[in-house]
């Protein structure tokens, strides 16, 4: 059966829900799709639809970021429901790296929790420009004074991490009641989406640069071949274009035989799209998450590079102690994390939290990087620094 075609009539924005586990992110995602479906702007998704993998449903926790599509009057959104459990911060990083804006979900009954802080910090570190706050479970925590207190606390926290805490929209609602069809709470979802439309800026897309998609997932469609999915970081791609798969393994060349977005076929994928790309003659085991799909010759894999790095202060969620040459943390580039050893410049014995430093890094596996590539450095479940590549060497 021929797939329906994706019609590009509204600007496309990538957005996501972040926040502490069990504060209601997945329920809110389901509620948004269900409320918008009544206006013909989405396909209603239940909690179980959003919470896709069986392992997630058993634990009631979202692990791999899952995508939902919907529209408002002015925009087309891809909504990623970000994992909220501490073990899955890694997924949050790759999910958040794709977000043009975020909805921070906070249960009015609990207030700000450890992961609330961590997610705001991560959103800042991966460059999410604006956050809208949804104060959830207000049907349960009905005391307006308590709601005011939580709102005040979250505004202070947003300001502390470099967001505009004073002006950020804070919507008070109940994802569960909206999902159940209560009109009072459904109106709060409309209010939330109006805030998202107006507060989260339309991203500038680099469509004129060479094509690059960071591979997030790989699967096989029987009879058709291997599909890679991910967000197009830059450039455009058409069916029959040649592409290279770069990083982690030897570079491979292939041809694009199909492009899809939200189960609809696409003539052209462009920067900002969350697309599935069908590849000719590639087996599922030949390609993996963390590689990139690129215009041939536009980017090379490197194991060694020099970078300008900022080491986070303790107050920013970073280390309490200095780092020295030989330190081996994980380096997060797009959808991959690779261990690397650092070498500090001659004459520099150690780097204190809060310092900027130029360092050389040797990764244990080659990654597709170029001058200007951004990365985070993590160790033991927390971000300890971030930086950008200033020079690559083979």
UniProtKB/Swiss-Prot annotation:
State its Enzyme Commission number(s).
Answer: 3.6.5.3
Q: Which CDD domains match?
A: EF_Tu (cd01884), EFTU_II (cd03697), EFTU_III (cd03707)
Q: Which residues form the signal peptide?
A: none
Q: Where is this region: G1?
A: 19-26
**One GO molecular-function annotation for this sequence?**
GTP binding
TM ranges are none
Would the keyword Magnesium turn up in this protein's UniProt record?
A: yes
Q: Which InterPro entries match?
A: EF-Tu_GTP-bd, EF-Tu_GTPase, EFTu-like_2, EFTU_2, G_TR_CS, P-loop_NTPase, Small_GTP-bd, T_Tr_GTP-bd_dom
Which positions bind Mg(2+)? 26
The organism sits in which domain of life? Bacteria
Reactions listed under catalytic activity: GTP + H2O = GDP + phosphate + H(+)
Gene Ontology, cellular component aspect:
cytosol
What's in the keyword line of the UniProt record?
Cytoplasm, Elongation factor, GTP-binding, Hydrolase, Magnesium, Metal-binding, Nucleotide-binding, Protein biosynthesis
Stretches for region G4:
136-139
Which residues make up the binding site for GTP? 19-26, 81-85, 136-139
Region described as G5: spans on this chain: 174-176
Question: Could you tell me where this protein is found in the cell?
Answer: Cytoplasm
Protein family membership: Belongs to the TRAFAC class translation factor GTPase superfamily. Classic translation factor GTPase family. EF-Tu/EF-1A subfamily.
**What's this chain's function?**
GTP hydrolase that promotes the GTP-dependent binding of aminoacyl-tRNA to the A-site of ribosomes during protein biosynthesis.
Record-given protein name? Elongation factor Tu
The organism of origin for this protein: Ureaplasma urealyticum serovar 10 (strain ATCC 33699 / Western)
Q: Give the source lineage, highest ranks first.
A: Bacteria, Bacillati, Mycoplasmatota, Mycoplasmoidales, Mycoplasmoidaceae
Gene name for this UniProt entry? tuf
């Amino acid at each position: 059966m021929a797939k329906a075609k994706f019609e590009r009539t509204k600007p496309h924005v990538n957005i996501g829900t972040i926040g502490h586990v069990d504060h209601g992110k997945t329920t809110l995602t389901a509620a948004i799709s269900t409320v918008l479906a009544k206006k013909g702007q989405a396909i209603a998704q239940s909690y179980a639809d959003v919470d896709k993998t069986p392992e997630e449903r058993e634990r009631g926790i979202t692990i791999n970021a899952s995508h939902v599509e919907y529209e408002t009057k002015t925009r087309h959104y891809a909504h990623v429901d970000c994992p909220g459990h501490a073990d899955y911060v890694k997924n949050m990083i790759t999910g958040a790296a794709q977000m043009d804006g975020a909805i921070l979900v906070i249960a009015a009954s609990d207030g700000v929790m450890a992961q609330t802080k961590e997610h705001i910090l991560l959103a800042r570190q991966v460059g999410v420009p604006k956050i809208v706050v949804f104060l959830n479970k207000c049907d349960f925590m009905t005391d307006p004074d308590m709601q005011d207190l939580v709102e005040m606390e979250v505004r202070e926290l947003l300001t502390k991490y470099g967001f505009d805490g004073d002006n950020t929209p804070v919507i008070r609602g109940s994802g569960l009641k909206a999902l159940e069809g209560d009109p009072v709470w459904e109106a709060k979802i409309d209010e939330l989406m109006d805030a998202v439309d107006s507060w989260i800026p339309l991203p500038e897309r680099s469509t004129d640069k060479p094509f690059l998609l960071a591979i997030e997932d790989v699967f096989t469609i029987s009879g058709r071949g291997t599909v890679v999915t991910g967000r197009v970081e830059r450039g455009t791609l058409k069916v029959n274009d040649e592409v290279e798969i770069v990083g982690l393994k030897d570079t491979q060349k292939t041809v694009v035989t199909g492009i899809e977005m939200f189960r609809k076929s696409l003539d052209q994928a462009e920067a900002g799209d969350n697309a599935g790309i069908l590849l000719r003659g590639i087996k599922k085991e030949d390609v993996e998450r963390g590689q990139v799909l690129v215009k041939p010759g536009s980017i090379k894999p490197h194991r060694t590079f020099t970078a300008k790095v900022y080491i986070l202060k303790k107050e920013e969620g970073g280390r309490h102690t200095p780092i020295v040459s030989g330190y081996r943390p994980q380096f997060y580039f797009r959808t991959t994390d690779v261990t690397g050893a650092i070498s500090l410049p001659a004459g520099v014995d150690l780097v204190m939290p809060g310092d900027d430093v130029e360092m050389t890094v040797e990764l244990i596996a080659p990654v597709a990087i170029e001058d200007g590539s951004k990365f985070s450095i993590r160790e033991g479940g927390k971000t300890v620094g971030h930086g950008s590549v200033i020079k690559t060497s083979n």
